[in-house]
Amino acid sequence: MSAIQGIEGVISQLQTTAMSARAQESLPQPTISFAGQLHAALDRISDTQTAARTQAEKFTLGEPGVALNDVMTDMQKASVSMQMGIQVRNKLVAAYQEVMSMQV
């Protein structure tokens, strides 16, 4: 008898999970704008550069707990993120120019 009750318990849990999944599917998803994503990416690049600059200043001042390898890693991360941002901008400008040169 306890095996049947265990199976019924599992079935009721599965039904509850299925109902909650259906309820979540019916909720409207927030819209994500291109401009918002671009702004967020630029903010992340800026934050990375600020963190690297702060880390370098701490190392220069001789604060304990700041190692040279951490500073160099942060500086490289900032450099790579900046280069990525520049390349994305270049691709966006090229795409814009291509669209503007199309004849209607």
Swiss-Prot record:
Q: What name has this protein been given in UniProt?
A: Flagellar hook-basal body complex protein FliE
What does the UniProt entry say about where the protein is found?
Bacterial flagellum basal body
Q: Which organism is it from?
A: Escherichia coli (strain 55989 / EAEC)
Its main subcellular localisation, reduced to a broad class, is: other
UniProt-listed Pfam families: FliE
What protein family is recorded? Belongs to the FliE family.
Q: Name one GO cellular component term.
A: bacterial-type flagellum basal body
Q: Which UniProt keywords apply?
A: Bacterial flagellum
User: GO terms for molecular function, please?
Assistant: cytoskeletal motor activity; structural molecule activity
Which Gene Ontology biological process is one annotated for this entry?
bacterial-type flagellum-dependent cell motility
